[in-house]
Amino acid sequence: MTQCPQEMITPGHGIIADALIMHGLIKILHIEGKMEGWAERRGERFVVCAERPDLNWIDQWEPMELLEIAAEFKAKGKDRASEEEEQRPYFGLVHDLSRSTVDPGNFSSWISDVREALYALKADFDLSEEHKEKRGEGRARSKKRGYYTLYLPLSGVYGKYVVENYGIRQSQYAVCATCFALSTLGYIYGTVKARVERRSSSGGGHDVFNLTFIPRERTSLRSLMALQRMAGLVEMRPGDLNELGAVVYMLSVGETIYAVREGVDILVWVTQRAGNFQRTVGVNIFRGDRLLEAIAEIKYRAPSWPKIARQLGSSLNVLGEYLAFGGDVYHVIRSVMADLGRKGGKLAGLEGLAEALKKIG
């Protein structure tokens, strides 16, 4: 890899927010053609070595138009009935973002905030070593002008209670325009989201499984950019998937990435909504290169696998455990067969799955 032109480091808002800030920066560097460089993890922060972005184009960027449309509708619709407000003309990346949120009541504010932060990004951009301390980011009783709430999908800390002087208070986690804009871009362009409606017997609401790739070792920006091709939203039927099962599902139905030969991990977190309650649970890190290689092998030997995966439920959890940690290949096949049988699915293609699992194991 080439010598580092400039070292930019994420501020330290937690591994979720920092991973998204890294991906937002990589997206911008890709647009500017500044992909000669690398990223690496340092604790829960990430270092990106590349030319500093100039951001002269950002006011004219196409996503800004989509954000403008959404913001204009909000302004015009203030006096409409609430049921009409729910049918906003969100499309493209804004639609996917709206389906990924677990806080729909604040979504229009998120859109307005990210639009404002993107306009400010050119003048505000700063990813220096002491960024967080210099900017005074973090918990605050009240937000300062030019600062933004780090909404729940972008972090695991939004809405938690803080103990202070033997009392308990709930305060927002405030960040600057750089952190807010880049983390939102990272969530849009660097994250696979899977929305699952929860059964009414479980209280209703929905979960969103979030998956992004992070470097386990020094990794080229081109490799991380290639993995961003998988980003987007998938809708899943109600089921009993855990984090690994959801990872297998998202990698199975999405684009197949063969080319990554560097050490990457998968960061997974789950955002949940039930009634007015929302939270982040299940933050995990899995070995990404192993899982990517395994799913690519399965798709190669069983071309119908994406269709099969869409029919499966809890057997994806069993498969995920096997792919991540090893185990009994026959137990996996039996579990998949039983799952398909319960759903009336066809068993064609399972021979290829068995061959792939034996090769992987």
UniProtKB/Swiss-Prot annotation:
<dbReference type="GO" id="GO:0051607">
    <property type="term" value="P:defense response to virus"/>
</dbReference>
<protein>
    <recommendedName>
        <fullName>CRISPR system associated protein Cas8</fullName>
    </recommendedName>
</protein>
<comment type="function">
    <text>CRISPR (clustered regularly interspaced short palindromic repeat) is an adaptive immune system that provides protection against mobile genetic elements (viruses, transposable elements and conjugative plasmids). CRISPR clusters contain sequences complementary to antecedent mobile elements and target invading nucleic acids. CRISPR clusters are transcribed and processed into CRISPR RNA (crRNA).</text>
</comment>
<dbReference type="InterPro" id="IPR010184">
    <property type="entry name" value="CRISPR-assoc_prot_MJ0385"/>
</dbReference>
<comment type="subunit">
    <text>Monomer. Can form a Cascade complex with Csa5, Cas7, Cas5a, Cas3 and Cas3'.</text>
</comment>
<keyword id="KW-0051">Antiviral defense</keyword>
<dbReference type="Pfam" id="PF09703">
    <property type="entry name" value="Cas_Csa4"/>
</dbReference>
